[in-house]
Each structure stands twice: as structure tokens, then as C-alpha cells.
């Protein structure tokens, strides 16, 4: 049954990629309720407001950005509407958190990644299914998918009740280097967006997934301010570069180190 659910959700994703890229996270269309069983929403015990997102990669582990670390994190799985919970919605807290560096330091172009082990594993359900880690890096020119509960307008902060989705394009890293002059010659980040602007991940989407061919290829990290400007793609942590570290941590090797 779990395999059937996974295959069904991959089919939904493939159909989504075939759509015309007119959907927006900024001011755009709502995700289909059955399209996103793997994203999770993060909030703190003190505040019920979502501040970041993440991705369930198996029943016990969530992948997100290092910049999303907080005290007393609460992780909501199986959520669509913030105001009308799904029957299979579940809430978990971290058991352990892992970073590339013990100091939890990261930069805009390096090591913005955090792996969270849940205190209690989740059960797969209609709206809770893990997303696969990448088997290979994404190709330049790929059409990928972003989704999240981040702001849907650029002139002011407007948070939606349900997540919004968009298709964006994968660019060569050099495209982002031309825009963001402080980027190093090489980094473990992906450059993706829409060059004419109007489509982008934005505030509170941080930590959420960039999905290509049914796999998590990126983690929302940072971009231009305000979001969705022309010729200013966003940057995403390149998950493929960290797969060995992720798999080592999950296997119990908690001293595993990230690639330099």
C-alpha cells in the first residue's frame, strides 16, 4: 500500500511538471491537496505561526535549512490548510538535530542544511509520504517544482492558508554569480527561478523542497529582496552534494562530516 501511495504521488508530480509555468508561489495558485504529502511546516511552541518548511525523507527524518533552527521546534506533517486540519495530520518534535558544522555556522552559499530526527516516527497516510533523495544531480534546463506557505505577495507580507506551488527553471550556477557578485566561483548551491520574474520562493518558504523528477534536489535557502524580481533567481542548497552525509547520519554515523 505504501508503494502504491508513493507511485501515485509521483504521478501527480509528473503531471504538475507538464503544466504551463504560470503558477506562482508569489501571488499564485494553490497546490492540489494531494500534491504535497512530503513538505512539513515548522513553528515554535511559543508561536503557532509557520516560520519555515522542511521535507520528510523517511518516517523518522526531516530535511530543512540550517537557518531554520530554533528552540522548541514543532513539526507539522500532513498539513494543507492551516485553519482546517487534515484528519491524518501529525505533530512531532525533534529528538536530534544535525548540522554540517558543530558550530552550526553556514553561509549563503555553503552548508545551509539541517537534518532533524523525529522523537517519534510518523505513519504513512494519504497526506504523509516521504520524498526520495536524489539519485543524480539536476540538469540545467530542468523544470522543477517549488511549494510552500510563504508570502504570496512582494509589496507586503501575505501568508496563505494553504501552500502555493510553481514551476521554475534550473539554471547554470554562473547565472546567479552574475547577479550576486559575492558568490564564490564554486559552491554547493543550485540556481533556479524564472528570468522574467514574478515566480519565486519567498519568506517562510525557507527550508522547503525544490523538486525535480520526483526527488528533492534543493532546499530553499535565499534569493533577491524583494522576491521574484526579474533576472534574480534564488539559490537552493544542492541536496545531491550532501546525500552521503545524510545517509551516513541516518545510518547511525553521527560523526560523519559534510563535503568541504
UniProtKB/Swiss-Prot annotation:
SMART domains noted in UniProt: Tryp_SPc (SM00020)
Free-text tissue specificity from the UniProt record: Expressed by the venom gland.
GO terms classed as biological process: proteolysis
Residues the record marks as carrying a glycan: 123, 253
InterPro entries: Peptidase_S1_PA, Peptidase_S1_PA_chymotrypsin, Peptidase_S1A, Trypsin_dom
Record's signal peptide: 1-18
Propeptide feature ranges: 19-24
Peptidase S1 domain: residues covered: 25-251
Locations listed in the record: Secreted
Entry's Gene Ontology cellular component terms: extracellular region; secretory granule
Domain of life: Eukaryota
Main location group: secreted
Gene3D superfamilies: Trypsin-like serine proteases
Family membership noted in the UniProt record: Belongs to the peptidase S1 family. Snake venom subfamily.
Function in brief: Snake venom serine protease homolog that may act in the hemostasis system of the prey.
Protein name: Snake venom serine protease homolog 2
Upper taxonomic lineage: Eukaryota, Metazoa, Chordata, Craniata, Vertebrata
